[in-house]
């Protein structure tokens, strides 16, 4: 079964992961729950009377509409923050762990535990105990390679992603204007 990986960074390098079973309960659940609450379902192209989610229609523009909820000021801020955690290459610095945990717990309460967000919040909260952990990130599904570990041709092995040296990431509370 697939899983969502929560990646801990120590001294700016990806260090280890904690897994949350069933990746479908992560990003896909967040997208579906928020779509259901904030957007009208779409008509199926083959039957306009049948209403379907944007993800089930595999409509790239429809999925973008879901992602845009992160910028929609009518959507509660905690929900927008959680939506942003589902985006590629997002990182949350230690100084913002309390904010992300609060947002995740609020999201879980709003959506009555219909996702793995509470489990993710618990993992991040456990990271607070380790003062060497300076950031967290997500690999939303284990069916792909983890973007937080690079391949070294020279060493012929996986090497940690470094937040100071590598630049293919962004910081949730620094780089998005909506927060």
Which sequence ranges carry the predicted segments?
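Acidic (Asp/Glu-rich) sequence patches and key acidic residues
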Residues: 1-179
């Amino acid at each position: 079964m697939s899983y969502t990986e929560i990646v801990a960074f120590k001294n700016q390098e990806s260090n280890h992961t904690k897994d949350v079973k069933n990746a479908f309960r992560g990003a896909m659940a967040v997208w579906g729950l928020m779509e259901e609450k904030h957007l009208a379902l779409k008509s199926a192209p083959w039957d306009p009377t049948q209403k379907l989610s944007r993800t089930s229609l595999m409509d790239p523009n429809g999925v973008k509409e879901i992602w845009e909820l992160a910028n929609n000021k009518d959507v509660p801020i905690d929900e927008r923050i959680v939506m942003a955690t589902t985006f590629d290459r997002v990182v949350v610095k230690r100084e913002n762990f309390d904010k992300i945990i609060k947002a995740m717990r609020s999201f879980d309460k709003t959506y009555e535990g219909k996702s793995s967000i509470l489990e993710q919040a618990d993992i991040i909260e456990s990271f607070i105990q380790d003062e060497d952990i300076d950031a967290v990130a997500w690999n939303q599904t284990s069916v792909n390679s983890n973007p937080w570990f690079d391949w070294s041709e020279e060493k012929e092995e996986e090497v940690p992603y470094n937040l100071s040296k590598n630049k293919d990431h962004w910081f949730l509370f620094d780089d998005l204007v909506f927060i």
